């Protein structure tokens, strides 16, 4: 056992710079590939398939999307490929400035019919939704959004794609890996651990890995929270209608989550908080800005728009 371990350690020691560069490039490449080649991966994952056939993009959704592009002022040379998605919120990926372009999944619920029809059966987390129940009625109302709310939801995705922040979100992983390696190597040289027993260096490396992972989660989550807040403010700054639509959009999400919390019973209590926010998967991480925080931020913008003299 000692022989292979020593050979592996010696190999890593000789080629550590090449391994570091390759690992950082691999982390960056894996994350960015989803945006470099969004079609047909994203559409395959989120395409709406009613009655076993992919739903074409309706003229209404196409018109809505074009209206949003016009409001934002997207150049005609930027490539967008919208499609009908089964999700409750829009999804997107890609870089519109590149030849592969960007794809945007527009929820089928924006049409109203697939959800507002009580005869249409919907299964969420393995349970069929009872549209006649109070929670089912509340969910159906939450999924029915106004024109302004739909525009805000779509515009937020377009702003995300136009700003290119997807590339920024891929940086924490390789940056933290390189930083952890550089600091750990420097610390081991300073402490003279390279002249000591291998077990001591192994223990130090394990501690460095834990510290590096904590730094990665903190930087990634902090960046995500900052970007989500910026996207909301940037989208709402388009006009007062977008501010109003943003407030309604997050109100609808919170209301829908509360309805799902009731419909799903004990499982719903594990997924959603009593306020309608999503329960974090890990107790030490906040992966996304709470919906209540995003709604309250836009409500402040709306009050400032309605009564500018008071602020």
From Swiss-Prot:
Transmembrane segments: 18-38, 165-185, 191-211
Family: Belongs to the TMEM177 family.
Gene: Tmem177
Cystine residue pairs: none
Mitochondrial matrix domain ranges by topology: 1-17, 186-190
Gene Ontology cellular component terms for the protein in this record: mitochondrial inner membrane
Subcellular location: Mitochondrion inner membrane
Keywords in alphabetical order: Membrane, Mitochondrion, Mitochondrion inner membrane, Transmembrane, Transmembrane helix
Spans within the Mitochondrial intermembrane topological domain: 39-164, 212-311
Major subcellular location class: mitochondrion
Bilayer topology: Multi-pass membrane protein
Subunit structure, interactors included: Found in a complex with COX20, COA6, MT-CO2/COX2, COX18, SCO1 and SCO2. Interacts with COX20. Interacts with COX1, MT-CO2/COX2, SCO1 and SCO2 in a COX20-dependent manner.
Name of this chain's protein: Transmembrane protein 177
Organism: Mus musculus
Role played: Plays a role in the early steps of cytochrome c oxidase subunit II (MT-CO2/COX2) maturation and is required for the stabilization of COX20 and the newly synthesized MT-CO2/COX2 protein.
Entries under InterPro entries matching the protein: TMEM177
């Amino acid at each position: 056992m000692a022989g292979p371990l020593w050979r592996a350690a010696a190999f890593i020691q000789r080629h550590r710079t090449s391994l570091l560069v390759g690992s950082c490039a691999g982390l960056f490449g894996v994350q960015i590939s989803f945006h470099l080649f969004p079609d047909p991966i994203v559409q395959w994952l989120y395409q709406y398939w009613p009655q076993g056939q992919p739903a074409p993009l309706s003229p209404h959704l196409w018109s809505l999307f074009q209206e949003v592009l016009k409001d934002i002022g997207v150049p005609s040379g930027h490539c967008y490929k919208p499609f009908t998605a089964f999700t409750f919120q829009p999804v997107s990926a890609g870089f519109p400035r590149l030849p592969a372009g960007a794809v945007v999944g527009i929820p089928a619920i924006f049409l109203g019919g697939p959800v507002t029809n009580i005869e249409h059966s919907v299964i969420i987390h393995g349970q069929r939704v009872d549209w006649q129940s109070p929670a089912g009625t509340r969910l159906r109302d939450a999924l029915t959004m106004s024109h302004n709310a739909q525009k805000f939801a779509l515009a937020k995705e377009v702003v995300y794609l136009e700003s290119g922040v997807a590339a920024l979100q891929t940086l924490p992983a390789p940056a933290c890996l390189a930083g952890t390696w550089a600091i750990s190597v420097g610390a081991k040289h300073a402490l003279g651990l390279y002249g000591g027993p291998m077990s001591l260096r192994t223990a130090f490396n394990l501690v460095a890995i834990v510290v590096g992972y904590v730094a990665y989660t903190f930087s990634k989550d902090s960046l995500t929270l900052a970007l989500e807040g910026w996207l909301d403010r940037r989208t709402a700054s388009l006009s007062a209608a977008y501010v109003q639509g943003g407030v309604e959009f997050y109100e609808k999400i919170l209301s829908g989550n509360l309805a799902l919390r009731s419909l799903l019973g004990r499982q719903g209590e594990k997924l959603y908080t009593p306020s309608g926010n999503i329960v974090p998967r890990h107790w030490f991480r906040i992966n996304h800005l709470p919906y209540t925080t995003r709604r309250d931020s836009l409500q402040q913008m709306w009050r400032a728009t309605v009564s500018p003299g008071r602020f």
